[in-house]
Design a protein with these regions (language model features):
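Loop-helix junctions at membrane interfaces
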Residues: 1-166
Length: 166
């Protein structure tokens, strides 16, 4: 790995931690954050494996510094998968609303609703029914907002990169 990639990864890790843990709303079972923005943009720019690793590192650092409670590795797996999915479907493409629908659906349904709900039921020893409904409502509301925000940030970042010839 080249030095510039290490530096870029470090910057995005710091940005993801800030957006996921500092500028966020956390309750026991529902988290509303903006960390998905930096993970998606990193995936678009650098691909699935780099985005997955960056997201996992950010999750580990964020949980270590700001986590409430005991460390649980399942969420690191989830964050890796989020980064990987965004990178796999969006890297090297001109991102449009249509192209963003599939990865955002996979992230929302498979990772946030199914996998993370499973981690929460294991971690808190609660029934899925006690956790799922609130998470479902949150994800239904956040789904279109996340797509819109990713598109807005992507357009701004790509415009900046073209201007600066990055």
């Amino acid at each position: 790995m080249k030095t510039d990639m290490i530096v870029k990864t470090g910057v995005f890790v710091a940005l993801t931690v800030l957006l996921s843990y500092i500028f966020a709303i956390h309750t026991t079972f529902i988290h509303i954050t903006f960390g998905f923005l930096s993970i998606a943009i990193f995936g678009i720019l650098y691909g699935p494996m780099a985005a997955g690793i960056m997201a996992a590192i950010a999750c580990f650092i964020g949980m270590s510094l700001f986590g409430q409670g005991v460390f649980f590795p399942g969420f690191i797996v989830s964050e890796f998968l989020v980064g990987y999915v965004y990178g796999y479907f969006l890297h090297g493409r001109n991102v449009t609303f249509k192209q963003l629908l599939l990865p955002e659906t996979i992230v929302t349904v498979c990772i946030h609703l199914i996998l993370n709900t499973m981690w929460l039921t294991i971690f808190y020893n609660k029934a899925v029914s006690a956790i799922f409904i609130g998470r479902l409502i949150k994800n239904i509301i956040c789904f279109p907002l996340e797509i819109a925000l990713i598109l807005i940030v992507y357009k701004a970042v790509s415009k900046f990169m073209v201007q600066k010839k990055l």
